[in-house]
Regions:
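N-proximal low-complexity "stem/linker" segments adjacent to membrane-targeting elements
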Residues: 1-25
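Short alpha-helix within the catalytic core of nucleotide-sugar-dependent glycosyltransferases
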Residues: 20-21, 45-46, 104-115, 158
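Acidic donor-binding segment of Leloir-type glycosyltransferases
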Residues: 21-67
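Active-site nucleotide-sugar/metal-binding loop of Leloir-type enzymes
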Residues: 76-92
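Short beta-strand-to-loop acidic/aromatic patch adjacent to the donor-nucleotide binding site
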Residues: 89-101
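Conserved donor NDP-sugar-binding/catalytic core segment of glycosyltransferases
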Residues: 101-136
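Conserved nucleotide-sugar donor-binding
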Residues: 147-162
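Acidic donor-binding loop at a coil-to-helix junction in glycosyltransferase catalytic cores
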Residues: 167-169
Length: 169
């Protein structure tokens, strides 16, 4: 099953290398990764350039956007910018936040979910480091909810819901 990944990023230089290292070390690599530099003022673009040079399946695009904080809007518009830049067909489309670390089998495990006919959206659990430095599962929503930090859409579902729409919340 082929999949493509879009990573919107605004001033994520401190986190982006961790995500990209874990993404490029998957046991099931994506067809294509599009990194969207969303008007960053730090070294985000330089990091994207570096990974795009090292990995043929990684590309980056720039987007000029407002400096204003726009909850639920800015990241979706950056994602849509990345969506327009995709060149390869995909069965599964993935949106990742830039501050994640993924285990090496994340996508091989995730893609098995889409072998079930009725699965249209899937994701995973966040494991975060607490104040004591210990890792713990952080999933404040019910089991049927997929966190926005890592959402994967079957292409048929993504088309049926009309893609992502910018909105608060």
């Amino acid at each position: 099953m082929n999949y493509s990944v879009i990573v919107p990023a605004h001033n994520e230089a401190g986190f982006l290398p961790g995500l990209l290292d874990s993404l490029c070390s998957q046991d099931c690599l994506p067809n294509e990764v599009v990194l969207v530099n969303d008007n960053s003022t730090d070294k985000t673009e330089e990091i994207m350039q570096d990974y795009a040079k090292k990995h043929l399946f990684v590309r980056y695009v720039n987007r000029i956007s407002s400096e204003e904080h726009q909850p639920g809007t800015k990241v979706v518009r950056a994602f849509q910018h990345g969506l327009k830049a995709l060149k390869e067909p995909y069965t599964v489309l993935v949106k990742l936040d830039a501050d994640l670390l993924l285990p090496p089998n994340y996508f091989s495990t995730l893609l098995t979910m889409f072998q079930q006919e009725k699965v249209g959206i899937a994701g995973g659990f966040c494991v975060e480091q607490n104040a004591a430095g210990q890792w713990e599962v952080n999933h404040p929503m019910h089991k049927g909810h997929v966190r926005g930090a890592f959402k994967a859409y079957h292409s048929n579902c993504f088309k049926a819901i009309g893609g992502l729409r910018p909105s608060m919340g």
